[in-house]
């Protein structure tokens, strides 16, 4: 059986089941990502968790605990450029990807790993925010899962028609003149977790907010700031027909 290299996991802030182990995986384009596994002895099935933008494995420790209580093994990952996975630019706080479809290579690596380990079936999957956008495209060509759930899926970015046109033009110019790896306009190293609870855009739950702040304060290597211009342009193109894609799944 193939051996997978163990990776760090910050159990002091994940508050997940003690049965967790985490590993490094290498994608087909040689990007190193991180995957975590919380095993259940009951083996009712496996739930895959696809995180959103700026998220990381540790955020889903409590979710894994809840799933384990119901007899389910669970899996989550750090997408490229997120958590402890390889960052793609010299500035680790820049949220960047060359093309949005590259995230599919990350999920393919996780599926191959899960198949190798023969994780208990049936398989289920949850896609949150950006993870929902990635998952939607994966489901068009793959039938690994018995059931799928989406949480606030990022199936588009709400922009007025003039602003959308500007974004495409700006993104094209940025690529030609090679500043597409800079922060997108109005964005910076400041991320979701740099706001106060009152101004945050993630949650109305003060306990959850404290949970997230503890994680990124104790382990700042998990943090990601704003996205690059390349990320935004690629996201707009990738999600432009998401509504039609959902019908075809």
Regions found by a protein language model. Name each.
Residues 52-55:
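Active-site glycine-rich loops that stabilize anionic/oxyanionic intermediates
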Residues 68-88:
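Conserved alpha/beta-hydrolase
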Residues 96-113:
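Alpha/beta-hydrolase active-site loop
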Residues 119-128:
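Alpha/beta-hydrolase fold nucleophile elbow
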Residues 127-137:
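Glycine-rich nucleophile elbow surrounding the catalytic serine of serine-hydrolase chemistry
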Residues 238-243:
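Conserved small/polar residues in nucleotide/adenosyl-binding loops
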């Amino acid at each position: 059986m193939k051996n997978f290299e163990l990776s760090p996991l910050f159990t002091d802030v994940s508050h997940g089941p003690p049965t967790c182990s985490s590993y490094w995986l290498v994608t087909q384009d040689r990007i190193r990502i991180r995957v975590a596994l919380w095993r259940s002895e009951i083996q009712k099935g496996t739930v895959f968790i696809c995180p959103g933008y700026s998220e990381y494995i540790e955020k889903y420790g409590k979710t894994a605990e809840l799933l384990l209580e119901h007899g389910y093994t669970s899996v989550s990952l750090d997408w490229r450029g997120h958590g402890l996975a390889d960052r793609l630019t010299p500035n680790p706080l820049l949220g960047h990807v060359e093309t949005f479809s590259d995230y599919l290579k990350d999920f393919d690596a996780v599926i191959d790993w899960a198949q190798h380990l023969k994780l208990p079936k049936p398989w289920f999957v949850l896609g949150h925010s950006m993870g929902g956008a990635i998952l939607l495209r994966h489901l068009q060509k793959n039938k690994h899962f018995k059931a799928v759930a989406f949480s606030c899926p990022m199936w588009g970015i709400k922009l007025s028609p003039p602003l959308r046109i500007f974004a495409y033009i700006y993104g094209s110019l940025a690529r030609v003149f090679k500043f597409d790896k800079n922060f997108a306009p109005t964005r910076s190293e400041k991320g979701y977790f740099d706001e106060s609870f009152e101004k945050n855009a993630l949650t109305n739950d003060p306990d959850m907010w404290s949970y997230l702040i503890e994680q990124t304060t104790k382990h700042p290597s998990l943090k990601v700031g704003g996205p690059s211009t390349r990320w935004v342009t690629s996201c707009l193109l990738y999600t432009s027909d998401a509504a039609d894609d959902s019908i075809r799944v």
